[in-house]
Amino acid sequence: TQYSKKEEISTDSYQYLIGVSLPNVIEPWLNNFVDVFTEKVSQDKKINVIFRDAAGNPEKQIQDIETLMEYGIDILIVSPDGSDSLSSVLSEAFQKIPVILTGVGAGTEDYTCLIKSDDQKIGRLAGEYILNNLYEKNKKIVVFQGVEESPVSKQRLKGFQDSVQGTIPEEDITYYCGDWLRDRAELRMKDYLISHDSADIVFAFNDDMAYGAYQACQQYRIEGKVHLIGVDGFEGESAGLSLVDKGVLDATIQTPDFGGLSYEIARKLLEGNKVEKNIIIQPELILQGGAERKE
């Protein structure tokens, strides 16, 4: 990947050094995090950043954090993998410098700030949108979850299931794990279409998987008949907002700009300001033709 270039220290002179530890940058939201954070830092002469990608290996993420601490960083930003494996290394870091967590917690209260989305609400918004706008009796729904044990994926699933329970029969919903990846979702969608005539509605827990499902539908020439809902709502050529504008997705549920928010929180801390310990960002349903905020 191009990611290795971003692991280098990028500027010669700076006042503050930020270390960022990510569990697996292949996940689209973490890739977006890197892009946004890098862009912010490139415009800030006082700050430099070092990224470390654990590539899905929890042991490596612990080592990455220890290495970043050895570099003498001023702030540590970590996206945990959802387990408690980082709790002790984060506690050690927190004794010395501010620690910002993004996405999920890490089984410890030893952090300065946690930025997360209301993931149950994301699932609920999708379920309510499907019920109110798309679902009719006997319509078939395909749901693409993220990585099986991901807390984010579990929360989105709970929100969705709570919202449709008792209204949509279980036999009308098929669940797959797409592991957050476009290619995986495309393959699973093809598997589904081989054994079923068609699908009516797809809800994917990120826009990349929604687009993968769309590509499978294209190959079966049913793309115009299937309603697709994604999550993330990032900007970019094949990202969620663009896919909604083009009519590929019916809707996306926009999640926080983790890269931008993490940069702002880090900046405040470096300037000696206090920040909230827990920041929960409310999701927003984005439809074709504009945004519709749902409470």
Where do the protein language model's features map onto the residues?
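Extracytoplasmic "Venus flytrap"
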Residues: 17-36, 50-59, 80-83, 148-154, ...
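Exported/periplasmic ABC-transporter solute-binding proteins
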Residues: 215-256, 263-270, 274, 279
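Hinge/cleft segment of the Venus flytrap/periplasmic-binding protein
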Residues: 2-9, 148, 152, 164, ...
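Flexible loop/hinge segments that line or gate small-molecule binding clefts
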Residues: 82-121, 234-245
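Hydrophobic alpha-helical
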Residues: 76-93, 160, 173-174, 178-239
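Hydrophobic alpha-helical segments within soluble ligand-binding/sensing domains
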Residues: 61, 114-141, 155, 184-186, ...
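Short, solvent-exposed amphipathic alpha-helices that sit
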Residues: 29-43, 47, 122-126, 151-169, ...
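Short beta-strand elements in bilobed, periplasmic/extracellular small-molecule ligand-binding domains
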Residues: 37, 41-54, 140-143, 164-183, ...
